[in-house]
Amino acid sequence: MLTMSKFKLPSDRLWPRASTLIKPNLKKADIALVGVPAHKSSISPTSAHLTPKAIRTALEKYSTYAGSKQIDLRGLNFTDLGDIANPDGQEGKKRVHKKLNGVLENYQTLVALGGDNSITFSVASALFPDLSKVGLVTLDAHHDLRDGNTNGSPVWRLIQAGLPGKNIVQIGISDFANSKEYSRSEERRVGKEC
């Protein structure tokens, strides 16, 4: 059986691959990628820690050009800051904060590749110590308003840390994917659900 990891894509100078844009550890760049392969706090078993590597591998299949918008990404500088080792739990949160402290001073945009969505809290709180001026858009079937430190709680933890609910937009919230008790409709006052 032939898998993508064993298959070598042909080289074509007229088809620049997205993966070739990313240079490791540039001191300054327009966009920086960082892997945050968290998975141990997931409510259900997961292999989410494999996602950063899978995304990087998938970039080998994509070009740099968005034809519908006529935008070529080759004009931007991309860098890869690598993966944050063992990002789970309180010690992992400290490692995330250490790695991301001041990162937006050198990189215009940071793309954090999870892991499970527990990284939302660690990454947002590392980048924005004052959450009162931050907005959050989630793409998820779940509200993520559970108690505790799991992949089901990052939005609630951010609200408790100072993120105003009115600054949150949740896209994809599904019926039968959340409990009435964890909807926390009065406490969270989420700005918009789509």
Predicted regions and their residues:
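Conserved alpha-helical scaffold segments that buttress catalytic/binding sites
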Residues: 2-192
